């Protein structure tokens, strides 16, 4: 289920409850001229993401847009610096264990297009 990002990503991740999983789809921003994400790999991954997350009430995902191409390409992009995102698309899996520790797993770039890797990553 697609959830709105109501606050900062840091706050959203801090509020992941124990034994809960939140997915974060790090995506290229939409190009105002084409009305599509500027990154072709993101455009290719979106149908897979949307199909999986829209068809499940158990899987929660928020979409985060990393910026236009020049913003993304800067080494100081906040998603590169704060969250260690190196490519788009990236699907982050954030799970808080019973002890309260937040575990992070990432499915990066072309791996997001591999249906087997994607299904295994989201546990469907």
Swiss-Prot record:
Its main location: cytoplasm. It is found in: Cytoplasm; Nucleus. This is Thioredoxin domain-containing protein C21C3.12c. It comes from Schizosaccharomyces pombe (strain 972 / ATCC 24843). GO terms for cellular component: cytosol; nucleus. One of its GO terms (molecular function) is protein-disulfide reductase [NAD(P)H] activity. Keywords: Cytoplasm, Nucleus. Belongs to the thioredoxin family. Gene3D superfamilies: Glutaredoxin (3.40.30.10). The active site is at residue 39. GO terms for biological process: cellular oxidant detoxification. Residues 37-124 form the Thioredoxin domain. PANTHER family: 42-9-9 PROTEIN-RELATED, THIOREDOXIN DOMAIN-CONTAINING PROTEIN 17.
């Amino acid at each position: 289920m697609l959830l709105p990002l109501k606050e900062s990503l840091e706050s959203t991740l801090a509020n992941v409850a124990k034994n809960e999983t939140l997915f974060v789809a790090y995506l290229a921003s939409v190009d105002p001229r084409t009305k599509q994400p500027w990154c072709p790999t993101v455009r290719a991954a979106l149908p897979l993401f949307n199909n999986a997350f829209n068809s499940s009430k158990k899987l929660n995902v928020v979409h985060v847009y990393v910026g236009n191409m020049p913003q993304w390409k800067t080494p100081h992009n906040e998603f590169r610096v704060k969250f260690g995102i190196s490519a788009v698309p990236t699907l982050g899996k954030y799970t808080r264990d019973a002890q309260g520790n937040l575990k992070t797993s990432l499915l990066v770039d072309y791996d997001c297009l591999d249906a087997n890797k994607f299904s295994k990553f989201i546990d469907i």
